[in-house]
From Swiss-Prot:
This is Ribosome-recycling factor. Belongs to the RRF family. One of its GO terms (molecular function) is ribosomal large subunit binding. GO terms for cellular component: cytosol. The keyword Secreted does not apply. It comes from Methylibium petroleiphilum (strain ATCC BAA-1232 / LMG 22953 / PM1).
Amino acid sequence: MSIADIKKTFEQKSARSIESFKSELQKIRTGRAHPGILDQVHVEYYGSMVSISQVANVSLLDARTISVQPWEKGMGPKIEKAIRESDLGLNPSSQGELLRVPMPALNEERRRDLTKVVRGAGEDARIAVRNLRRDANDQAKKLLKDKAISEDDERRSLDEVQKLTDRVIAEIDRLVQSKEAEILAV
């Protein structure tokens, strides 16, 4: 293991953390429709719980309406019930086999609650990145202890990892601000 390996591993893991955070943000409902919002809703299908996207075509009808077209005829009522019982606050309407899921406008209290959720998810992502930084720093200190690198190399490694950490945390903060602005936009 070298300093370059430590840096590369940190960059890869922090990129995965950001991608995970982005997918987490997509699941948070804003006033706009987004097909990914139904990914967390599961429905029973032949004895096992599966995501709605595995048993139906989920698409957008317009900016505020999601369309759900089940692939099997009997799944419509089950999907409708699963969406209604989810904690998303959605109320689907059935038109034959097609389900329309209108996105209700968010009230001010719900918007504030969602911004708190976004901030909490952002803090969790920052903690994950800080843990990655700690692991990278521990590896550099271990290399120094094993006399594989000099103290100058260790200090340089710690500085580089800190700069990468600052950049990743700034990206997370930017994503949090962007999502909050999206939620608070009326």
